[in-house]
């Protein structure tokens, strides 16, 4: 006779084991109709699963924007499998999980699927979903599950059972009419909940992510609770495609990538201008917050990487080379090099905190399939810093790091930031006392600034707790960029010490700090955030001057030279083209200010100013415009008056 406790504290007693659906029915038919699954004692279960003992129960409905939506998407992956097997009986089904904003299914099929094929598959999915058929779950023995999939010619399911499922388990088989899939669940009770979906694209994917295995076809899709949400998501995707940094990188002549250097960026003049401006900006923050800038070697001996522990953990991701019977590695990170700099010369507690920063060129041998424009590369530059401090200085230093993060992000217009604090894992180094002190210091730093944060229990690194900063862009996409990570391990491994107040040798605490993360990736984020319409201080070309006739050419050149001498990136367009044509062309290039000079402007020593969005700012004296734009650049103004 289980007693079920509901979220409002009320209780219901039942004479026999009861399912989530039956509890919902006892409350009301409306709730039962909306019920997708349940959460029993915090664990998600199918609506049909029986609750045999006293338990707390949350009923997951179609309105649940987290669990409910994830379950709908997972069931849509099964629906995709159902449609595929009807249209392509020879297809071998692999896995079909959910991902951010959607789902996918990996299949083994000799025929290469096209976009037209996806439309055909989606049509069949909609026909099946329209019938709102019941999804029937059956728990079976491991052997019965294996026999089922072996008889159905599904080798990937058999392999999963052989290698990933205990012989003592009772796998869940979900029957979608004649189609059977295997899953932990939960899934929707019927296909009436899966009505608003679409298939996005198809790509290649190695089985189990291993390039030694067969290449499968991965079909991506997305699903939502209602038509409005699906349409809004597709609109965001269309906007994201317009803002794609790879497309704009080519259009604005910022960078390119090529096969001979996979994952390495060829920066063009325009893109490198942005890169350098970012460095100048970050350097100004380093000066403001009391950092010293250093530069470490790009290549270091394997011996150092073994001492630091990176060889054991990162060897597969490191590029290596050898010379004179010694093995070297390109650095994947900067921290071991910074400890070497710290170790030069005797350090006292009076020298701490010591804040060391570097624009470090790092290389990681990322899988080719993971590379994505300048967002995911093999060669990148980190705005990396390491702070060597005493235990008593942790809170103040972390607070300054947090201030620097927010100060930096706000300059770029990012004000929607989610903060997560990761605490001690089960396996860790350092005493409980130092972990207690450090976690409390991180909490106090965040709370003193009234910053809301989520705690990720046990998600810290083995060598210390950390704070992660995830910023959200104009399309509400999440980008994890900044980190503040405490480290009780590396300084000791690499022999870093300082002399304490009582002349004893002590090991400093090390704080790893990154704000932009990778400059390459952050520039990619900015390209998409601004859609190429960079604020004037970052724009590769800030001003373009255009003549109406050849008569004004000398005056235009004179004004351009004056602007350039004033530190403004200005160019002249003296082509024998109509002024409207020139304006349209430079508008597409996202040049912030377009200056037009005709006879009247030339005779008055003026320029006619308009913005790239078409706003007419009127006529300026040249010196007045220089003062106007210099002020905008100096304060790093975010938006043009347009």
Curated annotation (Swiss-Prot):
Catalytic, as annotated region: 244-535
Binding residue positions for Zn(2+): 335, 386, 512
Cofactor binding note from Swiss-Prot or TrEMBL: Binds 1 zinc ion per subunit.
Gene Ontology cellular-component terms listed: cytosol
InterPro entries, per database record: aa-tRNA-synt_IIb, aa-tRNA-synth_II, aa-tRNA-synth_II/BPL/LPL, Anticodon-bd, Anticodon-bd_dom_sf, Beta-grasp_dom_sf, TGS, TGS-like
Cofactor: Zn(2+)
UniProt protein name: Threonine--tRNA ligase
Species for this entry: Vibrio campbellii (strain ATCC BAA-1116)
């Amino acid at each position: 006779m289980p007693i079920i406790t509901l979220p409002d504290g009320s209780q219901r007693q039942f004479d026999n084991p009861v399912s989530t659906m039956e509890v919902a029915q006892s409350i009301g038919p409306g709730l039962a109709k909306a019920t997708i699954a349940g959460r029993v004692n915090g664990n998600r279960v199918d609506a049909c699963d029986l609750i045999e003992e006293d338990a707390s129960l949350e009923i997951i409905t179609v309105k649940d924007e987290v669990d409910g939506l994830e379950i709908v998407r997972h069931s849509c992956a099964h629906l995709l499998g159902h449609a595929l097997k009807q249209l392509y009986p020879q297809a071998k089904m692999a896995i079909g999980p959910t991902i951010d904003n959607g789902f996918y299914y990996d299949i083994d099929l000799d025929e290469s699927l096209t976009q037209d094929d996806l439309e055909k598959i989606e049509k069949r999915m909609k026909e099946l979903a329209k019938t709102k058929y019941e999804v029937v779950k059956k728990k079976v023995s491991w052997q019965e599950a294996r026999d089922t999939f072996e008889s159905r010619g599904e080798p990937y399911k058999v392999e999963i059972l052989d290698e990933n499922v205990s012989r003592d388990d009772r796998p869940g088989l979900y029957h979608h009419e004649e189609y059977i899939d295997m899953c932990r669940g939960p899934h929707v009770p019927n296909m009436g909940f899966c009505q608003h979906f679409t298939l996005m694209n198809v790509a290649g994917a190695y089985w189990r992510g291993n390039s030694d295995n067969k290449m499968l076809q991965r079909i991506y899709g997305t699903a939502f609770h209602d038509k409005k949400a699906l349409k809004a998501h597709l609109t965001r995707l269309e906007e994201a495609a317009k803002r794609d940094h790879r497309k704009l990188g080519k259009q604005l002549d910022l960078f390119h990538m090529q096969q001979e250097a996979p994952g390495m960026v060829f920066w063009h003049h325009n893109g490198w201008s942005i890169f350098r401006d970012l460095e100048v900006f970050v350097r100004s923050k380093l000066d403001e917050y009391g950092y010293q800038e250093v530069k470490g070697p790009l290549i270091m001996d394997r011996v150092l990487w073994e001492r630091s522990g990176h060889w054991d953990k990162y060897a597969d991701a490191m590029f290596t080379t050898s010379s004179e019977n010694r093995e070297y590695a390109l650095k994947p990170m900067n921290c071991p090099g910074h400890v070497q700099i710290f170790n030069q010369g005797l350090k006292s507690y009076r020298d701490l905190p010591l804040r060391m920063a570097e624009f470090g060129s790092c290389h990681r041998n990322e899988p080719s399939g993971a590379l994505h424009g300048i967002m995911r590369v093999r060669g990148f530059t980190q705005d990396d810093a390491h702070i060597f401090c005493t235990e008593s200085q942790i809170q103040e230093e972390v607070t300054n790091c947090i201030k620097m993060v927010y100060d930096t992000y706000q300059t770029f217009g990012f004000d929607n930031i989610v903060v997560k604090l990761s605490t001690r894992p089960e396996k860790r180094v350092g005493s409980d006392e130092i972990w207690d002190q450090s976690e409390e210091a991180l909490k106090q730093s965040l709370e003193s600034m009234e910053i809301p944060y989520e705690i990720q229990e046990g998600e810290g690194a083995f060598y210390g707790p950390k704070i992660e900063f995830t910023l959200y862009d104009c399309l509400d996409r999440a980008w994890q960029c900044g980190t503040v990570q405490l480290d009780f391990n590396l300084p000791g491994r690499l022999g870093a010490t300082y002399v304490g107040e009582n002349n004893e040798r002590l090991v400093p605490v090390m704080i790893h700090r990154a704000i932009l993360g990778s400059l390459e990736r952050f520039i990619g984020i900015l390209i998409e955030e601004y859609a190429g319409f960079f604020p004037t201080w970052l724009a590769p070309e800030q001003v373009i001057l255009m003549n109406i006739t050849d008569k004004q050419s000398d005056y235009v050149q004179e004004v351009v030279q004056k602007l350039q001498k004033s530190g403004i990136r200005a160019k002249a367009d003296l082509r024998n083209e109509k002024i409207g044509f020139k304006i349209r062309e430079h508008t597409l290039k996202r040049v912030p200010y377009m200056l037009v000079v005709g006879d009247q402007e030339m005779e008055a020593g003026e320029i006619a100013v308009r913005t790239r969005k078409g706003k007419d700012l009127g006529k300026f004296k040249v010196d007045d415009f220089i003062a106007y734009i210099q002020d905008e650049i100096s304060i790093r103004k975010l938006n043009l008056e347009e």
